[in-house]
Design a protein with these regions (language model features):
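Buried hydrophobic core positions in alpha-solenoid tandem helical repeats
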Residues: 26-28, 59-61
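Solenoid-like repeat scaffolds
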Residues: 1, 29-36, 65-70
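Structural detector for internal amphipathic alpha-helices that build alpha-solenoid repeat scaffolds
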Residues: 6-20, 29, 39-53, 71-87
Length: 87
């Protein structure tokens, strides 16, 4: 259905305009999908935070805890998670 992981993110962004709840589910699925590239997962988590900050916390945590994710991306996810904790 999608040619790339970025296409999935693009589709979720378009969905956010019409159905934020469905977009949040899509962003969460992308962010938690270990088959998706690290940067795309982080991007999905960041976009999820814009749509539903509470739902972004588990997504950021999943990225931060994933030992297969690069250190910089894991650190960014942890920083985003810390920022969400202040909401």
């Amino acid at each position: 259905m999608y040619e790339s992981d970025e296409d999935r993110v693009d589709a979720a962004e378009q969905l956010a305009e019409h159905n934020p709840h469905a977009a949040a589910e899509a962003f969460s699925a992308i962010a938690c999908d270990q088959a998706v590239g690290d940067e795309v997962r982080l991007s999905a988590a960041e976009l999820l935070a814009d749509v539903d900050p509470r739902a972004a916390a588990p997504a950021c945590l999943a990225i931060a805890r994933d030992g297969t994710v690069g250190d910089e991306v894991r650190r960014s996810a942890a920083e985003r998670l810390a920022g969400l904790a202040t909401l």
